[in-house]
From Swiss-Prot:
Pathway: Amino-acid biosynthesis; L-arginine biosynthesis; L-arginine from L-ornithine and carbamoyl phosphate: step 3/3. One of its GO terms (cellular component) is cytosol. It is an enzyme of class 4 (lyase). This is Argininosuccinate lyase. The gene is argH. The keyword Transport does not apply. Its EC number is 4.3.2.1. Transmembrane segments: none annotated. Keywords: Amino-acid biosynthesis, Arginine biosynthesis, Cytoplasm, Lyase. It comes from Rhodospirillum rubrum (strain ATCC 11170 / ATH 1.1.1 / DSM 467 / LMG 4362 / NCIMB 8255 / S1).
Amino acid sequence: MSSSTPTTPSIERTASTIWGGRFDSGPSAVMEAINASIGFDKRLYRQDIAGSKAHCTMLVATGILSKADGEAILGGLDRILAEIEAGDFPFSVALEDIHMNIESRLKDLIGEAAGRLHTARSRNDQVATDFRLWVRDAIDGVEGALARLQDVLITRAEEHADTVMPGFTHLQAAQPVTFGHHLLAYVEMIGRDRGRFHDARVRLNESPLGSAALAGTSFPIDRAMTAQILGFDRPCANSLDGVSDRDFALEFLAAASIASIHLSRLAEELVIWTSAQFGFVRLPDAYSTGSSIMPQKRNPDAAELVRAKAGRVIGDLASLLIVMKGLPLAYSKDMQDDKEPVFEAADTLELCIAAMTGMMETITPKVDRLRTAAGQGFTTATDLADWLVRALGTPFRHAHEVSGALVKMAEKKGVGLEDLSLAEMRTIEPRLTDEAIKVLSVDWSVRSRTSFGGTAPDNVRAACAAARARYAAKAPPR
């Protein structure tokens, strides 16, 4: 039968017909169930087909495969891609994984030539290549989503460069800041997240294809060619490492975990800020839910779920770390469990980024309430201490003591610092003047924070412009 003629097997094809030559009997139903990964690794179909097409092209170029067989294989792979994307592909659990499902279907379509595609290749380097390609695509998707969230945060920061709010330590009012300044803190966090994903992509971008099972191959393959076709920078230098390495997946999960923590911290603040006790912002209906029993409730469920899902991403990292920690070189079946944590983390992170982007784009800061809260809790006490240092030459530690004593006086009287009379204040520090009263204003406080990275409104506007320029230049290569 010619290589281009479809072959119909006389027995039902299973994975064991691919590797079962040395076995007397097939696997049990339980073995097939625990061994099968098609339920989740079917997501690798685009990458698997791309890797197979690159491998086929190289085999033809090096004379290992005939041009006729190569054309048949490439045509069959294109047809399989179309079938999968149309939802017409006959996936089979008995064929274990996406690689065997595609190979089996290719044999149905083009016959014996399909069996030549696996020349100089193992499932070990095949899956390592597919997985790297998938993670690379996921990194590009996540990085783009983070860039959009960054842009939304910068836009909102520009809008609220002058909006005064309380800054907190220990969740206690600390010093006045601007809402824009607060949002820019998350812009910086997300910038580092983008950098981590970019760095992971750089290290990921070496091709394991051609490593074969673990030792390389005796066929005269061109690994540089397949690497170039697939957009890798180079082939990996060691065949054992090529099939054993999952650092790229761990780095992706580590970057995803840190990004999830940042999203969770912002989500926690939204939960706090939307509470009646704070009342700093209002979430739109699109990102809120109600109660089945309490008609008045307006719950920040989207923010709460972003906060919760960070734990799942962190758990995915822990899961893969534990899988990999004790594995000898090269491939062990444990590594089949490397994909589900990565798939789940990528899906979860992209959903959380989308939810956070939507929330931050549509929240309504309650400007008057923010300003009122900024002046509560003696938040300008540090400004008074700084004035004592600048105007009177008081050592800061003594200035701190004086300001603290004035806070105690105001607290006992049940008033704010700015409500104390100058005469009352002079009972603590006789050298105080009317100028000291001025520094107790929250507006004066934020305007005075002009040091680089500070909260002064002009600083915030300049920081927004700088952030747009800086982070736009950090987009990873596509």
